[in-house]
């Protein structure tokens, strides 16, 4: 006779084991109709699963924007499998999980699927979903599950059972009419909940992510609770495609990538201008917050990487080379090099905190399939810093790091930031006392600034707790960029010490700090955030001057030279083209200010100013415009008056 406790504290007693659906029915038919699954004692279960003992129960409905939506998407992956097997009986089904904003299914099929094929598959999915058929779950023995999939010619399911499922388990088989899939669940009770979906694209994917295995076809899709949400998501995707940094990188002549250097960026003049401006900006923050800038070697001996522990953990991701019977590695990170700099010369507690920063060129041998424009590369530059401090200085230093993060992000217009604090894992180094002190210091730093944060229990690194900063862009996409990570391990491994107040040798605490993360990736984020319409201080070309006739050419050149001498990136367009044509062309290039000079402007020593969005700012004296734009650049103004 289980007693079920509901979220409002009320209780219901039942004479026999009861399912989530039956509890919902006892409350009301409306709730039962909306019920997708349940959460029993915090664990998600199918609506049909029986609750045999006293338990707390949350009923997951179609309105649940987290669990409910994830379950709908997972069931849509099964629906995709159902449609595929009807249209392509020879297809071998692999896995079909959910991902951010959607789902996918990996299949083994000799025929290469096209976009037209996806439309055909989606049509069949909609026909099946329209019938709102019941999804029937059956728990079976491991052997019965294996026999089922072996008889159905599904080798990937058999392999999963052989290698990933205990012989003592009772796998869940979900029957979608004649189609059977295997899953932990939960899934929707019927296909009436899966009505608003679409298939996005198809790509290649190695089985189990291993390039030694067969290449499968991965079909991506997305699903939502209602038509409005699906349409809004597709609109965001269309906007994201317009803002794609790879497309704009080519259009604005910022960078390119090529096969001979996979994952390495060829920066063009325009893109490198942005890169350098970012460095100048970050350097100004380093000066403001009391950092010293250093530069470490790009290549270091394997011996150092073994001492630091990176060889054991990162060897597969490191590029290596050898010379004179010694093995070297390109650095994947900067921290071991910074400890070497710290170790030069005797350090006292009076020298701490010591804040060391570097624009470090790092290389990681990322899988080719993971590379994505300048967002995911093999060669990148980190705005990396390491702070060597005493235990008593942790809170103040972390607070300054947090201030620097927010100060930096706000300059770029990012004000929607989610903060997560990761605490001690089960396996860790350092005493409980130092972990207690450090976690409390991180909490106090965040709370003193009234910053809301989520705690990720046990998600810290083995060598210390950390704070992660995830910023959200104009399309509400999440980008994890900044980190503040405490480290009780590396300084000791690499022999870093300082002399304490009582002349004893002590090991400093090390704080790893990154704000932009990778400059390459952050520039990619900015390209998409601004859609190429960079604020004037970052724009590769800030001003373009255009003549109406050849008569004004000398005056235009004179004004351009004056602007350039004033530190403004200005160019002249003296082509024998109509002024409207020139304006349209430079508008597409996202040049912030377009200056037009005709006879009247030339005779008055003026320029006619308009913005790239078409706003007419009127006529300026040249010196007045220089003062106007210099002020905008100096304060790093975010938006043009347009």
From Swiss-Prot:
| Source organism superkingdom | Bacteria
Q: Does the keyword Ribosomal protein apply?
A: no
Reactions accelerated catalytically: tRNA(Thr) + L-threonine + ATP = L-threonyl-tRNA(Thr) + AMP + diphosphate + H(+)
Q: Which SMART domains match?
A: tRNA_SAD
In this entry, which stretches build a coiled coil? none
Q: Which residues bind Zn(2+)?
A: 335, 386, 512
Chain intervals for the UniProt region annotation (Catalytic) = 244-535
Instruction: Quote the InterPro entries the UniProt record gives.
Output: aa-tRNA-synt_IIb, aa-tRNA-synth_II, aa-tRNA-synth_II/BPL/LPL, Anticodon-bd, Anticodon-bd_dom_sf, Beta-grasp_dom_sf, TGS, TGS-like
How are cofactors bound according to the entry's free-text note?
Answer: Binds 1 zinc ion per subunit.
PROSITE patterns reported for this sequence: AA_TRNA_LIGASE_II (PS50862), TGS (PS51880)
The text of the family note is: Belongs to the class-II aminoacyl-tRNA synthetase family.
Which protein, by its recorded name, is this?
Threonine--tRNA ligase
Q: Which organism is it from?
A: Vibrio campbellii (strain ATCC BAA-1116)
């Amino acid at each position: 006779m289980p007693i079920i406790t509901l979220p409002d504290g009320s209780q219901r007693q039942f004479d026999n084991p009861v399912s989530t659906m039956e509890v919902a029915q006892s409350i009301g038919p409306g709730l039962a109709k909306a019920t997708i699954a349940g959460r029993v004692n915090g664990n998600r279960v199918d609506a049909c699963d029986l609750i045999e003992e006293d338990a707390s129960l949350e009923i997951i409905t179609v309105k649940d924007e987290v669990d409910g939506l994830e379950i709908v998407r997972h069931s849509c992956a099964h629906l995709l499998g159902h449609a595929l097997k009807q249209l392509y009986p020879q297809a071998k089904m692999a896995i079909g999980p959910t991902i951010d904003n959607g789902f996918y299914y990996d299949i083994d099929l000799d025929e290469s699927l096209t976009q037209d094929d996806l439309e055909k598959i989606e049509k069949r999915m909609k026909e099946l979903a329209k019938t709102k058929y019941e999804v029937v779950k059956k728990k079976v023995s491991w052997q019965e599950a294996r026999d089922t999939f072996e008889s159905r010619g599904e080798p990937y399911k058999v392999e999963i059972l052989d290698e990933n499922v205990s012989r003592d388990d009772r796998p869940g088989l979900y029957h979608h009419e004649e189609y059977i899939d295997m899953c932990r669940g939960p899934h929707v009770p019927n296909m009436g909940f899966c009505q608003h979906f679409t298939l996005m694209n198809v790509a290649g994917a190695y089985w189990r992510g291993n390039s030694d295995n067969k290449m499968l076809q991965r079909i991506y899709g997305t699903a939502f609770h209602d038509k409005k949400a699906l349409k809004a998501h597709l609109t965001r995707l269309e906007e994201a495609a317009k803002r794609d940094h790879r497309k704009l990188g080519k259009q604005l002549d910022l960078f390119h990538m090529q096969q001979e250097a996979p994952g390495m960026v060829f920066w063009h003049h325009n893109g490198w201008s942005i890169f350098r401006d970012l460095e100048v900006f970050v350097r100004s923050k380093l000066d403001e917050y009391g950092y010293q800038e250093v530069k470490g070697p790009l290549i270091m001996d394997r011996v150092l990487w073994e001492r630091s522990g990176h060889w054991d953990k990162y060897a597969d991701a490191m590029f290596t080379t050898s010379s004179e019977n010694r093995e070297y590695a390109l650095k994947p990170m900067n921290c071991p090099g910074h400890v070497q700099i710290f170790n030069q010369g005797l350090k006292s507690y009076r020298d701490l905190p010591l804040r060391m920063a570097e624009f470090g060129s790092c290389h990681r041998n990322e899988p080719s399939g993971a590379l994505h424009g300048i967002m995911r590369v093999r060669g990148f530059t980190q705005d990396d810093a390491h702070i060597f401090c005493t235990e008593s200085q942790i809170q103040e230093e972390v607070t300054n790091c947090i201030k620097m993060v927010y100060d930096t992000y706000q300059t770029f217009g990012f004000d929607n930031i989610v903060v997560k604090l990761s605490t001690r894992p089960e396996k860790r180094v350092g005493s409980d006392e130092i972990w207690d002190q450090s976690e409390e210091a991180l909490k106090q730093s965040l709370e003193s600034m009234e910053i809301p944060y989520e705690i990720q229990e046990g998600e810290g690194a083995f060598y210390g707790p950390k704070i992660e900063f995830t910023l959200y862009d104009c399309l509400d996409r999440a980008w994890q960029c900044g980190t503040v990570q405490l480290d009780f391990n590396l300084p000791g491994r690499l022999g870093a010490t300082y002399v304490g107040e009582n002349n004893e040798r002590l090991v400093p605490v090390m704080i790893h700090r990154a704000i932009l993360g990778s400059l390459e990736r952050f520039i990619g984020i900015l390209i998409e955030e601004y859609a190429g319409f960079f604020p004037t201080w970052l724009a590769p070309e800030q001003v373009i001057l255009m003549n109406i006739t050849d008569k004004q050419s000398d005056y235009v050149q004179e004004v351009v030279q004056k602007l350039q001498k004033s530190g403004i990136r200005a160019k002249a367009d003296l082509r024998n083209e109509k002024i409207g044509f020139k304006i349209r062309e430079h508008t597409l290039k996202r040049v912030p200010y377009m200056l037009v000079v005709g006879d009247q402007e030339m005779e008055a020593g003026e320029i006619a100013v308009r913005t790239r969005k078409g706003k007419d700012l009127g006529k300026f004296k040249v010196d007045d415009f220089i003062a106007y734009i210099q002020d905008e650049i100096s304060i790093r103004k975010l938006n043009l008056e347009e």
